[in-house]
């Protein structure tokens, strides 16, 4: 469930970074810095390079986001 005002877009994980951060390339070609949502951490959902994910972006800063779903 998206937060009010958040923008959900799909993308592909390009590289893992320290502190559970990931560089994600969106379908429109932009690259954003994303972290894992709390529920995904709670349930130990692993994210690997090349995974397809849904990223939730804030309308205030479109260069950072939160990974909220990983496709199987």
UniProtKB/Swiss-Prot annotation:
A Pfam family it matches: eIF-1a
Domain named S1-like: residues: 1-72
Coarse class of the protein's main subcellular location: cytoplasm
Gene Ontology molecular-function annotations: ribosome binding; rRNA binding; translation initiation factor activity
InterPro entries: NA-bd_OB-fold, RNA-binding_domain_S1_IF1, S1_domain, TIF_IF1
Keyword set, alphabetical order: Cytoplasm, Initiation factor, Protein biosynthesis, RNA-binding, rRNA-binding
Compartments where found: Cytoplasm
Family from the record: Belongs to the IF-1 family.
Assembly: Component of the 30S ribosomal translation pre-initiation complex which assembles on the 30S ribosome in the order IF-2 and IF-3, IF-1 and N-formylmethionyl-tRNA(fMet); mRNA recruitment can occur at any time during PIC assembly.
Purpose of the protein: One of the essential components for the initiation of protein synthesis. Stabilizes the binding of IF-2 and IF-3 on the 30S subunit to which N-formylmethionyl-tRNA(fMet) subsequently binds. Helps modulate mRNA selection, yielding the 30S pre-initiation complex (PIC). Upon addition of the 50S ribosomal subunit IF-1, IF-2 and IF-3 are released leaving the mature 70S translation initiation complex.
Descriptive protein name: Translation initiation factor IF-1
Provenance organism: Corynebacterium efficiens (strain DSM 44549 / YS-314 / AJ 12310 / JCM 11189 / NBRC 100395)
Gene (name only): infA
